């Protein structure tokens, strides 16, 4: 297809990439581009919206999956010898034993943009103070609660953490904002840069967590950690009599990933320890002769699949609350034929009709599986956390609004790290979960970043506290620059999205425009990614920006279809019949909570999803 013929129809900034596409890719691009120019795809009937999303995903899979580092194609193995998830993530991809394992490179969704000369431009302290720091708290209404905020942090503890360098660097707040900063300066470890020893991208960063959706926030990322969490009886994990995580003498929780956590993540880790142990009991009842190791492996597979399913068809559906996205996310799991057909007849057809889960073989689209730098960047969602938690009484009588009575307000800053574990032990699971369920989380917008994160005690890998506090808001701005993630406008171009020409294209908020202009001038190319994601006009029903959503489109599907335990090995032979039935009958977090705390759901959860505020009538 001649590029010249269609040149007037393509945005000038996207003509170069368009000209290099194949004939059929150009057709697909023109289709989505027509909707993008009119901001239409989310306003059209569901079938057309699904066609748009599938076309966009297909293009992103072709142009926005970049390998970093050499692929270990020589490390072949027999998948039948590894019908279980290894602790460090190895031996999942039959053609690349190392793919997705601990201490392998983050991939890329776009070529890196070196910003070593612009690490402090504009100053991260200024950006954090003038554009991110919370002023008047904004929440998400009934759509999304604090459990939903904790859930995505629970997932991040499963997916990704960058290896740090041993040395430290420091940054100091300029005089213009120093008096408004909780910390006037702070020290931190830079991200460790490693040579990739390959063509293409020369420098990369290691992910010290396993990139697979393998429940490593519960199980750990290596054998050393996993061994400390097991009872070695009937496949079970250690858990306190109170249903909370156990702790070492120094107060550090015993769980898969405990670094830089808070009480909200801890209760989800504890809940899924109970889920794992319940799966062990159920499978043992059907197979009484299984060993401890066999029960553990089966239960880990089942529990990891439950977590992935909850995220796919429950959490994401509430995050992106539109009819089209509900259909799209359910299609990822069940296919367009739907749950009844799939549960009755199994996987039929390809990924569209039958879904990504249960495909005959995994598909990594020719690029070794990993999570990416850009994926990390769009998951910077600390503004979801409110400043205070209204503690509610699960044993009390409903108040005038038919809600559990409030006991007190707790500063969520006191629920972070080791202090948070102490608080949680006094509060208990039921009270904590109920309180988080009944309270809306923060909105992902400008001026909504919690103040306690700007004076935060970071932790070492073993969960112990470091001596130097950090300003997390300023550090997050710095991290994207340090890791060569393109700034907002270029980020959009690389995703085939129409870039902004002025601040008015970004937002209609006059105060935001004035403040952004004061910091970045009129140069829209300087806008930091995090600021753009928070400032961007949102699609109705979306709790996140459309720009971030495009990374979701690509990577949410990839986490399922590249993993053989969600594709070729998603079967009774690998999971057991009871295990498969367990996954099939779990449709959301509500089901998991109901399994272990039925009195909470029966008395207090009126919403259909545990991620909506629990008194919501939907």
UniProtKB/Swiss-Prot annotation:
Effect in UniProt of substituting residue 311 to A: Reduces oxygenase activity 38-fold
Listed result of changing residue 559 to E: Reduces oxygenase activity 71-fold
Cofactor comment text: Binds 1 heme b (iron(II)-protoporphyrin IX) group per subunit.
Binding site for hexadecanoate: 311, 599
EC number, as in UniProt: 1.13.11.92
EC class of the enzyme, as a word: oxidoreductase
Protein's name in the database: Alpha-dioxygenase PIOX
């Amino acid at each position: 297809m001649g590029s010249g013929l269609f040149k007037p129809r393509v945005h000038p900034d996207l003509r170069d990439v368009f000209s290099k596409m194949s004939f059929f890719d150009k057709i697909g691009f023109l289709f989505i581009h027509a909707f993008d120019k009119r901001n239409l795809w989310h306003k059209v009937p569901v079938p057309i919206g699904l066609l748009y999303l599938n076309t966009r995903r297909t293009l992103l899979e072709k142009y926005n999956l970049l390998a970093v580092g050499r692929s270990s194609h020589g490390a072949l193995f027999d998948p039948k010898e590894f019908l279980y998830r290894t602790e460090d993530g190895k031996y999942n991809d039959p053609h690349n034993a190392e793919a997705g394992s601990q201490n392998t490179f983050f991939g890329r969704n776009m070529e890196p943009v070196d910003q070593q000369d612009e690490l402090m431009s504009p100053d991260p302290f200024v950006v954090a103070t003038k554009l991110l720091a919370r002023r008047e708290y904004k929440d998400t209404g009934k759509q999304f609660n604090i459990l939903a905020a904790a859930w995505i942090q629970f997932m991040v503890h499963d997916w990704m953490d960058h290896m740090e360098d041993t040395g430290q660097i420091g940054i100091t707040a300029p005089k213009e904002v120093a008096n408004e900063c909780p910390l006037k300066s702070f020290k931190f470890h830079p991200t460790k840069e490693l040579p990739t020893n390959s063509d293409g991208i020369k420098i990369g960063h290691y992910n010290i967590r396993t990139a697979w959706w393998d429940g490593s926030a519960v199980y750990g990322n290596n054998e050393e950690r996993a061994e400390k969490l097991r009872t070695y009886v009937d496949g079970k994990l250690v858990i306190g009599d109170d249903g909370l995580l156990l702790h070492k003498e120094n107060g550090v929780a015993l769980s898969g990933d405990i670094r830089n956590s808070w009480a909200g993540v801890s209760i989800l880790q504890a809940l899924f320890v109970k889920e794992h142990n319940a799966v062990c009991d159920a499978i043992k009842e059907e197979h009484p002769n299984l060993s401890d190791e066999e029960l553990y492996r089966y239960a880990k597979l089942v529990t990891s699949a439950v977590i992935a399913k909850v995220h796919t068809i429950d959490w994401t559906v509430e995050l992106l609350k539109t009819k089209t996205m509900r259909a799209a996310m359910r299609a990822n799991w069940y296919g367009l034929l739907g749950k009844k057909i799939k549960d009755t007849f199994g996987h039929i057809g390809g990924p569209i009709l039958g879904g990504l889960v249960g495909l005959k073989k995994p598909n990594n689209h020719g690029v070794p599986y990993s999570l990416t730098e850009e994926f990390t960047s769009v998951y910077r969602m600390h503004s979801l956390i409110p400043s205070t938690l209204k503690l509610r009484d699960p044993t009390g009588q409903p108040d005038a609004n038919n809600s559990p009575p409030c006991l007190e307000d707790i500063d969520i800053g006191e629920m972070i790290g080791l202090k948070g574990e102490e608080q949680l032990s006094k509060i208990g699971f039921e009270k904590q979960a109920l309180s988080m369920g009944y309270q809306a989380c923060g909105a992902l917008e400008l001026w909504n970043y919690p103040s306690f994160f700007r004076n935060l005690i970071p932790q070492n890998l073993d969960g112990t506290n470091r001596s130097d506090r950090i300003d997390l808001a300023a550090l997050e701005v710095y991290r994207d620059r340090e890791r060569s993630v393109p700034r907002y406008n270029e980020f959009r171009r690389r995703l085939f999205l129409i870039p902004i020409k002025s601040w008015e294209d970004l937002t209609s908020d006059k105060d935001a425009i004035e403040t952004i202009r004061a910091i970045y001038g009129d140069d829209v190319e300087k806008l930091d990614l995090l600021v753009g994601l928070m400032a961007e006009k949102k699609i109705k029903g979306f709790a996140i920006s459309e720009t971030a959503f495009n990374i979701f489109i690509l990577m949410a599907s990839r986490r399922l279809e590249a993993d053989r335990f969600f594709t070729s090995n998603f079967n009774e032979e690998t999971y057991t019949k009871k295990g498969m039935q367990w996954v099939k009958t779990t449709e959301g977090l509500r089901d998991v909570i109901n399994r272990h705390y039925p009195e909470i759901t029966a008395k207090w959860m009126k919403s259909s999803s545990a991620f909506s505020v629990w008194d919501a009538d939907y």
